[in-house]
Amino acid sequence: ADSRKPDDRYDMSGNDALGDVKLATYEDNPWETFK
């Protein structure tokens, strides 16, 4: 949802609000969330 996300694969909806939620979860625990 913003430039801090590792790449576009993690913003699957294209929706900024949901993208920000995914980004926060990724920052907290990237491997458990996206393994």
Swiss-Prot record:
Expressed by the venom gland. One of its GO terms (cellular component) is extracellular region. It is found in: Secreted. It comes from the Eukaryota. The keyword Secreted applies. Its EC number is 4.6.1.-. Binds 1 Mg(2+) ion per subunit. Dermonecrotic toxins cleave the phosphodiester linkage between the phosphate and headgroup of certain phospholipids (sphingolipid and lysolipid substrates), forming an alcohol (often choline) and a cyclic phosphate. This toxin acts on sphingomyelin (SM). It may also act on ceramide phosphoethanolamine (CPE), lysophosphatidylcholine (LPC) and lysophosphatidylethanolamine (LPE), but not on lysophosphatidylserine (LPS), and lysophosphatidylglycerol (LPG). It acts by transphosphatidylation, releasing exclusively cyclic phosphate products as second products. Belongs to the arthropod phospholipase D family. Class II subfamily. This is Dermonecrotic toxin LgSicTox-beta-LOXN4.
